[in-house]
Amino acid sequence: MNYLYLCIRIMEDSIKIGLDAKRIVRNGTGLGSYGRTLANDLAGIDGLDLMLYAPDKGRDSLRNQVAERENLHFCYPNGLYQTALGKAFWRSKGIISQMQHDGIQVYHGLSGELPVGIRKSGIKSVVTIHDLIFMRHPEYYHSVDVKIYTRKFRQTLQEADRIVAISE
């Protein structure tokens, strides 16, 4: 936490950060807990404005675990992005135009993914990689899933400005 704080303070006095909030509003443990803890901790730092981007409102009980603060806001897709397919597209690509409109300077993909094209958008990006079990033990997964996860992982590595690895 101190390292992240130091990096942000060096960059400038005020910064707008976008966080991938899908797991924050949908997962009670694991990735969701990680995201809620990070969002709450970052919200306590002066000079940060946080925008939590989620494809929908998810579960009230999880969303309510995120502190209500002046510098923390949830953002959801609108219009054509309301269908399941639309939400998936928004999260993987359409979110970029919304972040540009919102003035996001840094986006953190909390669950190992970044929107396609974020590098070209001018928005700096950080991604947290939690595990690569699908690569180490592909026998635990359907072969199609391994291919999808591998493609997404490699794409994310190409897009990311910084990578946080929190497991072996």
Annotated model-derived regions:
Residues 1-168:
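Carbohydrate transferase catalytic cores enriched for Leloir-type hexosyltransferases
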